[in-house]
Regions:
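His/Asp/Glu-enriched, well-ordered alpha-helical/loop segment
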Residues: 63, 104, 109-185
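Long, well-ordered mid-to-C-terminal structural blocks that present hydrophobic/aromatic surfaces
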Residues: 83, 87-91, 108-111
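Glycine- and other small-residue-rich loops at beta-strand/loop junctions that grip anionic moieties
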Residues: 11, 43, 66-69, 91-92, ...
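Short secondary-structure boundary/capping elements
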Residues: 46-49, 69-72, 95, 122-126, ...
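Catalytic beta/alpha-barrel core
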Residues: 65-70, 87-96, 115-120
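Short acidic active-site motifs
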Residues: 53, 98-99, 130
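Polyanionic/metal-chelating signatures
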Residues: 1-88
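Active-site environment of divalent metal-dependent phosphoester hydrolases
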Residues: 71-75, 93-100, 149-151
Length: 185
C-alpha cells in the first residue's frame, strides 16, 4: 500500500504493479538459489545479499512480513504465499475482518497496526474490533506500537491492548497480544 511504498524511491505506483514487482523479485531469488546450488564449489554467481535473503524467505527459513491493509492487498499477499510457499506474516491488515476465512485457511498470523492511526485511504475501513475478531476466528494476532520514522512508539502498546479489551477482548487475551502472542509470531 501507499504507506509503505512511499518510503522508497521509484515506488511502483499501483498495487498491481507492486505485487508484480514482488513476484519478479521472488522469481529472481528462485533462479539465484538454483544457480548457487548448481554451481557447487565453483563458478557460483556473484553474491547478492538481497536475493540470498529472499531465497531464505522462499525456503521457509525466515518469514516474509508483508504490509497489506485492504482486503484486496491481503488476498494478493495470500496468493503470493500460495504461489511461492513462503511463511507469511500479515502486517497492518485493517480489513482482515473481511477475509477471515482466507487468512485462517492460509494459517497466517497477523500483526495489527495501532488504532490511533485513523487516516483515510487504506485505513478508512479499519475497525477497533479487528484484534478481537481475528482472535475469535482462531487467527494468531499481535498488536504493534507503530513508529515515527525509525523510533518505535513503545508507549502506545499498552494503550492498544487496552483498546482491544475495551472493544470486547478479555483482558488476559488483550495482554497476550502485546506479550506472548507477539513473541510467538
Amino acid at each position: 500500500g501507499p504507506e509503505v511504498s512511499s518510503n522508497f524511491s521509484g515506488r511502483p505506483g499501483s498495487r498491481a504493479k507492486g505485487a508484480a514487482l514482488v513476484r519478479a523479485e521472488f522469481i529472481k531469488a528462485q533462479d539465484y538459489a538454483r544457480r548457487v546450488k548448481a554451481s557447487g564449489n565453483g563458478n557460483a554467481p556473484a553474491r547478492d545479499l538481497k536475493l540470498e535473503t529472499l531465497a531464505r524467505v522462499l525456503d521457509g527459513e525466515i518469514p516474509a512480513l508483508i504490509t497489506a491493509q485492504r482486503a484486496s492487498e491481503i488476498l494478493t499477499a495470500l496468493r503470493l504465499q500460495r504461489e511461492f510457499g513462503f511463511r507469511l506474516v500479515l502486517d497492518g491488515a485493517a480489513e482482515a475482518y473481511l477475509v477471515l476465512d482466507e487468512i485462517r485457511e492460509a494459517g497466517v498470523p497477523v500483526i495489527v497496526h495501532p488504532t490511533m492511526a485513523r487516516h483515510g485511504g487504506t485505513l478508512e475501513n479499519a475497525t477497533l474490533e479487528t484484534v478481537r475478531i481475528l482472535r475469535d476466528a482462531g487467527i494468531p494476532v499481535a498488536l504493534q506500537s507503530g513508529f515515527e520514522g525509525y523510533v518505535p512508539k513503545t508507549r502506545v502498546v499498552l494503550f492498544e491492548a487496552a483498546m482491544a479489551a475495551a472493544y470486547g477482548m478479555p483482558f488476559e487475551q488483550a495482554l497476550a497480544t502485546v506479550t506472548i502472542d507477539a513473541a510467538r509470531i
